[in-house]
Amino acid sequence: MCIRDRYRRKLSAALSHLKPDITVSLLRREINFITSLKDGSKKIGELHVNRKNYRNFEKNESNFIKELFAKLWMKSLVRHLKKLDKFVVLSEEDRANWPELQNVKVISNPLPFQSGTFSDLNNKRITAAGRYTYQKGFDLLLEAWSKICNRHPDWELHIYGKGDKTTYEVLAGKWKLKNLFLENATPDMLCKYHESSIFVSSSRFEGFGMVIAEAMACGVPAVSFACPCGPKDIIRDGEDGLLVENGKTEELAEKINYLIENEQIRKEMGKKARINVQRFAEDVIMQQWIQLFNNLLNGTKQ
């Protein structure tokens, strides 16, 4: 018996024993059979990445076989998703990526904390956070920083994350970057947000972009690439932060310089950020889940 068959048998037995009203799947290997299990529960699928980067199968591949496999795999996935009672995605932007589906519901990730204090936005410090990987685009951020650090030599850029920093250390040396600190991940990011005056997200793509919301909850305005998917749902451009065309490092540098040089605007955006981001507060998001559960159990359309 293969691993998939064994998993199906055990999951089916567990659901038959538990008899849940609702089963929520994170759409791993059970996506191929979850809706066929006869345990009586409503089936919800929840996706924590966006469609364009789901398992990286829909990237533009030069290999014809890979392209064909990606299309066939996505066609099969959509067929299974249609059978779910509800399919939950993290952003309105990603909802639009699934035009074949009529059962899509947007429920964003909740903020993991409520900040009782806020940054005064006086420190000359810019912060970014995430794994040291291609996805997070720190190479693009360093390129932008090369256009900022000499213009504002009293400002610092601190990046916090896990992973191999070698690529970024090489770029920092190549571009002779000043006041750049490639930090390790820290368990106390809340403190780092409070020490910051600007938060930057340089990701090429995201599932949502929770670090943006976290920084905003601390009263820190964010500058972010308008990458798929999440930042455009979180940041209200020009009100509580600034969006930049994805991958455009010149524009990223311009927007960061703008907030550095306009203290009053920076502080006004910070105040609005900590208010606007409360739509992602835990109690708000949990109420959306409760409403979804109740509607499914009551047979209410939504």
Could you say what each language-model-derived stretch is?
Residues 25-30, 47:
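Short His-centered aromatic/hydrophobic patch
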Residues 93, 110:
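Carbohydrate-associated surface elements
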Residues 124, 128-147, 250:
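A conserved mid-protein helix/loop that constitutes part of the nucleotide-sugar donor-binding site
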Residues 168-186:
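Nucleotide-activated donor-binding/catalytic signature segment of Leloir-type glycosyltransferases, i.e.
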Residues 221-225:
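Short hydrophobic beta-strand element within catalytic cores of glycosyltransferases
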Residues 236-238, 242-249, 257-264, 278:
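Conserved acidic donor-binding segment of nucleotide-sugar-dependent glycosyltransferases
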